[in-house]
Design a protein with these regions (language model features):
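C-terminal motif of bacterial Sec signal peptides marking the signal peptidase cleavage site
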Residues: 33-36
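Catalytic centers of hydrolytic enzymes
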Residues: 51-61, 66-96, 134, 139, ...
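Bacterial signal peptide processing site
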Residues: 38-41
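Long, low-complexity, intrinsically disordered N-terminal extensions of eukaryotic proteins, enriched
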Residues: 24-28, 144
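Acidic, metal/ion-coordinating pockets
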Residues: 44-374, 440-444, 455, 611-614
C-alpha cells in the first residue's frame, strides 16, 4: 500500500491509513487498534480534548536530477555515492523510526541524466506512461513536491504531460490527462499568462492522523491538517526563456508566501511546510532573488522549510559550514528560528526535520525550540575511515529496468574515436582537452547557419566559448573524463552535460574583455609575498568559467590582480583586440539570456540566433562528421595562460586523484602533486601550480 493518504475519508478510515507507515497490519489488528483508541464518538471526543504531544518527521529529497539508480551513464558504471535507490532505503528506515512522517520532494527531479533525456527527447514516453523517476518515487509514496528550475528544461507541453495535465498555458492541451507524477505538485510563484492563475496549485492541504502521546502517557491518534506550499527560482524566465516567455510569469517567493500562507491557515492548516527550490543568500531581498531562504523564513505562518537548488547541505556541522549568514544556526538546524533542511543533491542525503508538535485539546502548534533538523547521508565512514554506503532499496531498480537498459543502449551508439584522454581535470589551470571540441562544434554550427541564413552578419568573425561543466564540485568523480579510444554518444553527453541549446550573440571587443574578466572570478586573488598556502580556485562555479580555445584569441589571466583587472594582453589574430570590432560568439541559451553578470548585453538583447538544437547534439554531429578526434586538432589550442609570477608560498588547488599524468600529457609542466588526499572527504587530491612557469 502506498503511504499517500486518501483525502476526504472519514476519521476512522484515515486512522487505518496511518499504520501501514510502520507495519503491514491485517484487518483484525487494525480493528483492534481502532477499538483501543475508542470506537464511539464519546471516547474520541475525550481523547481529543486531552493535551498531547507528537513528533512529525518531514523527510526531504531535493535536486535528484533523475538519478534513480546509483549509475553513471557517462561512464557506464555503478557509482554508490549517489542515487535515489539508496535514499529510498533511508526513507524506509526513517518510517520505521518515526510514527509520523511527511515525505516531500523539492524539485529539479526530471532532468539531469541520459535516462532523463532519453525519455524526454530521444524516445519520448507516451502520455499513458509514467516518467521512470516518478515511477521509482511512487514506490515510496511521496506526500507532495514542488518544481525546480530544471522542470522547465524540456518545455511546457512535456511538463504538462509528466504532471498529468492541467497546465492552462498557450500551446498546451490542458485537458490532456496523462499518467502524471503520483503526488500533489505545488508551486505558488509561477503563473499562467493566459489565466493569470498559478500554473499548478500553489499549495495543498493534507489531512493526516498523527500518532501522539497524551498528557496521561497514553498513545492516541489525532487528526491534523498540514499545508504544503512550493516556490521556485524566478530565474526560469531567463534560463528557459525560449519555452516560457509570454506563457508564464513569476512572483517573488516572499510575495507569494504573504499571499497564500494566510489562505492555508484560513483553510484550517495547523502546520505549514514551505518547499523552497532555492537556498540562502544574505543579499537584500528582491522579487527575482534566486536563493531567498533567509527572507522567506521570516514570513509569518511558515513552520518548517525545506531548501535546495544550491546542491549544498544544511544543517552543516563541519568546521567550515556552507552557510554562516546571520540568522543561520547550523547547530539548531534553523533559519531565523524556523526548522529547515537542505539535503544535498542526486540522492546523496535525506533531509530530516523532526517537528515537535503540541496539541492543546483544540489545535496543533509547533514547538520550534524543541524541533531539530539533520542530514542522513548515504555515504559514511567506518571506524577505520573506509567508505560505507547505504544499501540500495531492492524495490527500485526493477521498476525502471527496461528504460534503464534502453538508455544504456542508446548512449552506447558509436560516433568516432579519440587518440587522447579528454578531461576537465585540469581545465581550471589551462588544459583545453575537453573544451576545445565543444567550441569547435559550436563555432562551425553557428558559422554555417550565418553563411546560409544571416548574410548581414557574414563578415563578422565567429568565435565560441564554453566552460568545464563538470569541475569537481560534487567530488573527485565530478569531472568530464573520456578515455582514449572509441567515442559513443555517452561520451558526448559527458563533454556537454546540460540540455542547453546553441545561441549566437553579437558583441564587440570591449564586451569580450569584460566577459573574460567575469569568467576570471573563478580564481582567488593571489598574494605573491604570502609564505603560506593559497587556494587558487574560488567559489565561483566552474560552469561559469567561459573560455576560448583557439589560436586566434590569446590572453593572460593575472591572478595577483583583483576581480575586474585580470585579463592582460588580449589579442585577436596577433593584434590587440579592437574594443569596437564586432564579433559573433557561439554560446548557449543560459549564457545568452541570463548572463548579465558577465556583460549587460547577455540579457537576450544581443542574441542574433536562438537555434532549436541542443549543444550536446551539435557536438555529437560534429564528431560524426569528424570522427577521428586528435589532441593536435581538437585538444591542444590554449587561448589563455596565467601571467607569470613567482610566489613565496604554494598556490594549490584540488582535482581528481591519480590524475597528474593528465596534466603532464597536456603540457602543464607547472603542475605537481602535493597530497593524494586533500582532506575534503570527496575523493580529491591536492595539487600545486608554479605560476612562474
Amino acid at each position: 500500500m502506498q503511504d499517500t493518504f486518501l483525502r476526504g475519508q472519514p476519521f476512522a478510515v484515515r486512522l487505518a491509513f496511518v499504520f501501514p507507515r510502520r507495519h503491514a497490519l491485517g484487518a483484525l489488528a487494525c480493528a483492534a487498534l481502532l477499538a483501543a483508541c475508542g470506537g464511539n464518538d464519546d471516547d474520541g471526543d475525550s481523547s481529543a480534548a486531552t493535551p498531547a504531544t507528537a513528533t512529525l518527521a518531514v523527510l526531504e529529497t531535493t535536486d535528484l536530477h533523475f538519478n534513480v539508480r546509483s549509475f553513471d551513464y557517462f561512464k557506464l558504471a555503478e557509482d554508490k555515492t549517489y542515487g535515489f535507490e539508496r535514499t529510498a532505503t533511508l526513507v524506509r528506515a526513517a518510517r520505521k523510526e518515526f510514527a509520523n512522517t511527511l515525505l516531500v520532494d523539492n524539485g529539479d527531479t526530471i532532468q539531469g541524466t541520459a535516462l532523463a533525456d532519453y525519455e524526454a527527447t530521444v524516445s519520448p514516453i507516451p502520455c499513458t506512461q509514467q516518467l521512470t523517476m516518478y515511477k521509482a518515487m511512487g514506490a515510496l509514496g511521496f506526500d507532495a513536491g514542488t518544481l525546480g528550475n530544471h522542470e522547465f528544461n524540456y518545455g511546457l507541453p512535456f511538463l504538462n504531460q509528466v504532471l498529468g495535465g492541467g497546465l492552462e498555458v498557450d500551446g498546451v492541451d490542458a485537458t490532456k490527462k496523462c499518467a502524471g507524477n503520483g503526488y500533489p505538485a505545488v508551486l505558488a510563484n509561477v503563473y499562467s499568462s493566459k489565466t493569470k492563475k498559478p500554473l499548478v496549485q500553489p499549495y495543498t492541504v493534507l489531512e493526516r492522523t498523527l500518532v501522539a502521546k497524551s498528557s496521561d502517557g497514553k498513545e492516541v491518534q489525532l487528526p491534523i491538517k498540514i499545508g504544503v506550499i512550493g516556490f521556485t527560482t524566478p530565474g526560469i524566465m531567463n534560463w528557459d526563456k525560449r519555452f516560457l516567455e509570454g506563457k508564464v510569469y513569476t512572483e517573488g517567493a516572499v510575495e507569494a508566501a504573504q499571499k497564500y500562507v494566510p489562505e492555508l491557515r484560513a483553510k484550517g492548516a495547523q502546520l505549514v511546510v514551505a518547499l523552497l527550490h532555492g537556498g540562502l543568500d544574505a543579499s537584500s531581498y528582491s522579487p527575482t532573488m534566486e536563493n531567498p531562504g533567509l527572507h522567506l523564513s521570516k514570513v509569518p505562518g511558515i513552520d518548517a522549510m525545506v531548501m535546495g537548488h544550491q546542491h549544498s547541505v544544511f544543517p552543516d556541522l563541519s568546521a567550515q559550514p556552507a552557510f554562516t549568514q546571520a540568522g543561520v544556526d547550523n547547530k539548531a538546524g534553523t533559519i531565523n528560528g524556523v526548522p529547515a533542511v537542505m539535503a544535498s543533491s542526486w540522492g546523496k542525503a535525506l533531509g530530516v526535520i523532526q517537528l515537535a508538535l503540541k496539541w492543546d485539546g483544540k489545535a496543533w502548534s509547533v514547538d520550534k525550540a524543541a524541533s531539530k533538523s539533520e542530514l542522513r547521508n548515504i555515504q559514511t565512514k567506518d571506524a577505520a575511515g573506509a567508505n560505507v554506503f547505504v544499501a540500495a532499496d531492492p524495490a527500485v531498480a526493477p521498476l525502471i529496468e527496461s528504460q534503464h537498459q534502453a538508455a544504456i543502449n542508446y548512449v552506447k551508439t558509436p560516433i568516432g574515436n579519440t587518440d587522447f584522454r579528454m578531461s576537465t581535470l585540469f581545465a581550471d589551470v589551462g588544459d583545453p582537452g575537453a573544451i576545445q571540441i565543444v567550441n569547435q562544434a559550436q563555432q562551425a554550427y553557428v558559422a554555417a547557419y550565418i553563411h546560409a541564413n544571416l548574410p548581414q552578419y557574414a563578415q563578422l568573425p565567429v568565435l565560441s566559448v564554453s566552460a568545464p561543466f563538470k569541475s569537481g564540485f560534487q567530488g573527485g568523480k565530478d569531472f568530464t573524463d573520456v578515455a582514449a579510444g572509441p567515442l559513443a554518444i555517452y561520451n558526448a553527453a559527458d563533454l556537454y552535460l546540460y540540455p542547453n541549446t546553441v545561441y549566437a550573440v553579437k558583441v564587440n571587443g570591449a564586451d569580450i574583455k569584460d566577459w573574460l574578466e567575469a569568467a576570471a572570478k573563478r580564481f582567488n586573488q593571489i598574494d605573491p609575498a604570502k609564505a603560506g598556502e593559497q587556494a587558487l580556485i574560488s567559489t565561483f562555479p566552474g560552469y561559469n568559467f567561459d573560455m576560448f580555445t583557439t589560436a586566434d584569441v590569446q590572453y593572460e589571466i593575472d591572478v595577483t590582480q583583483p576581480v575586474g583587472s585580470r585579463i592582460k594582453g588580449l589579442t585577436y589574430k596577433g593584434q590587440p583586440i579592437d574594443p569596437a570590432q564586432e564579433f559573433v560568439i557561439a554560446t548557449n541559451n543560459y549564457r545568452a539570456t541570463s548572463g548579465k553578470s558577465f556583460i549587460p548585453k547577455l540579457d537576450g538583447s544581443a542574441t542574433i540566433w536562438a537555434s532549436p538544437d541542443a549543444n550536446r547534439d551539435v557536438v555529437i554531429e560534429y564528431v560524426r562528421k569528424n570522427p577521428q578526434v586528435t589532441r593536435v586538432a581538437n585538444g591542444a589550442a590554449k587561448s589563455w595562460r596565467f601571467t607569470q609570477v613567482t610566489t613565496a608560498g604554494d598556490v594549490v588547488f584540488s582535482s581528481g586523484a591519480d590524475a597528474l599524468p593528465v596534466a603532464q600529457a597536456a603540457g602543464l609542466a607547472g603542475v605537481s602533486l602535493l597530497a593524494a588526499d586533500d582532506g575534503s572527504g570527496k575523493g580529491m587530491a591536492k595539487y600545486k601550480i608554479d605560476l612562474s612557469k
